[in-house]
């Protein structure tokens, strides 16, 4: 649920533990 400050529109999430939701990366 915490935003990782990343976009995953083109590339996957870089930070470990972050998942892609609606083109944004979130961790828990």
Swiss-Prot record:
Keyword Nucleotide-binding attributed: no
Record location of the Cyclopeptide (Gly-Asn) cross-link: 1-28
Pfam families named in the record: Cyclotide
InterPro entries according to UniProt: Cyclotide (IPR005535), Cyclotide_sf (IPR036146)
Disulfide bridge map: 4-18, 8-20, 13-25
Lineage top rank: taxon: Eukaryota
GO BP, sorted A to Z: defense response; regulation of defense response to virus
Keywords: Antiviral protein, Disulfide bond, Knottin, Plant defense
Post-translational modification: This is a cyclic peptide.
PROSITE patterns according to UniProt: CYCLOTIDE
Domain notes: The presence of a 'disulfide through disulfide knot' structurally defines this protein as a knottin.
Family statement drawn from the similarity comment of this UniProt entry: Belongs to the cyclotide family.
The protein's role, per its UniProt record: Probably participates in a plant defense mechanism. Has anti-HIV activity.
Descriptive protein name: Cycloviolin-B
